[in-house]
Regions:
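Catalytic center-proximal scaffold of phosphoryl-transfer enzymes
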Residues: 1-263
C-alpha cells in the first residue's frame, strides 16, 4: 500500500491528535490517502515523524494538505506541486469575517472559492480535464481582488516576521497572495482535489475510537491497529467486502491491491 501511494499522482496528507502511550504524552495519527489507498501511522507533527512515515521522502506527485508549515519544508522540494485544502481556507476566511464583521473581502473570497469548487465538481463529473477559462477566470479575478483588498485593509505589524504576531487574517491573506498557485492548482486539472476531505474522513474513526476507549496505553499496539485500519480502508475503497477480506487474511490468503496499469 505504501509503495502504491508513493506512485500516485495525487495524495492527501493530514494528521490528528491521539492520546496514546504514557499519560501526559500527545501523539498524532498521520495519514496519506488517495481514492484507492489509505495509510495511517503513529508519530508526531515534526519533520522527523513526517520522514519516518516514509511517504513524503519518496513521493514525487502532488500533495494536498492544509497550510501547516512542515509540508513546505525544503526537504520536500522534489514534490511536483502542492494543493492547499480549500475547506481549511474557507474556515479561515470565516474566522476573518468574524474578526472584521464590516469587511467585504472575507465573504467575497469564500464565494469565489466555493464557485471554483462547484465548477470543479461539474467539470470532473462530466469528464472535463479542467474548468473552462470562461467559468474560472471571473472567479479567480474575484478571489484575487478580495485578497488584495484584505491586504490593504489588514496591514502587517512591523517587526521580525518570526517573532511579530500579525493581525487576524494577515497570514492567511499573505499565503493566498504568495502561494496562489497552490490555492488554485485544481482549476486547471480535475485530477487534483480542491479539498482534503478524503483525508479528514479517513481520520474520523480514530477520533470516534478515542472518545469510546480513551487513552491507548501501548504505542506498539496502536500502530498495529492503524496498520489494520490501513488495510481495511484500502479494501473498502476497492469494493472488497471487509469481513470476507479479514477472513481471507486470517486463513492465509490475504487480498492485495492490484498493481496500477502501465502508462
Amino acid at each position: 500500500i505504501k509503495t502504491l501511494i508513493t506512485l500516485s499522482y495525487v495524495v492527501g496528507f493530514d494528521e490528528t491528535t491521539l492520546r496514546a502511550g504514557p499519560a501526559g504524552t500527545k501523539r498524532y495519527v498521520l495519514s496519506a490517502v488517495t481514492e484507492l489507498y489509505s495509510l495511517f501511522g503513529l508519530g508526531g507533527r515534526d519533520l522527523g515523524s513526517f520522514r519516518d512515515f516514509d511517504i513524503l521522502p519518496d513521493f514525487a506527485g502532488i500533495a494536498v494538505h492544509d497550510r501547516y508549515q512542515n509540508y513546505y519544508n525544503e526537504g520536500w522540494t522534489h514534490l511536483a506541486a502542492h494543493q492547499a485544502c480549500c475547506s481549511h481556507l474557507l474556515r479561515d476566511f470565516t474566522d476573518a469575517a468574524q474578526a472584521y464583521p464590516d469587511a467585504v473581502w472575507p465573504e467575497q473570497a469564500q464565494r469565489a472559492l466555493r464557485g471554483l469548487i462547484h465548477a470543479f465538481n461539474q467539470a470532473r463529473d462530466t469528464g472535463q480535464p479542467e474548468i473552462t477559462p470562461l467559468v474560472r477566470d471571473p472567479l479567480i479575478s474575484s478571489f484575487r481582488h478580495a485578497v488584495r483588498v484584505g491586504l490593504a485593509q489588514v496591514p502587517a505589524n512591523p517587526g521580525p516576521r518570526s517573532r511579530t504576531k500579525q493581525p487576524p487574517g494577515r497570514v492567511l491573506l499573505e499565503f493566498c497572495r504568495d502561494r496562489e498557485t497552490d490555492v488554485l492548482l485544481f482549476v486547471t486539472d480535475t485530477r487534483i482535489w480542491p479539498t482534503n476531505n478524503i483525508s479528514e474522513r479517513g481520520l474520523r474513526p480514530t477520533k470516534t475510537q478515542q472518545k469510546i476507549s480513551g487513552r491507548l496505553p501501548s504505542e506498539i499496539i496502536t500502530q498495529d491497529r492503524l496498520d489494520i485500519r490501513s488495510y481495511i480502508d484500502t479494501m473498502r475503497k476497492h469494493g472488497v467486502d471487509v469481513l470476507t477480506g479479514i477472513r481471507d487474511a486470517l486463513t492465509g490468503n490475504p487480498w492485495q491491491p492490484p498493481l496500477p496499469a502501465p502508462t
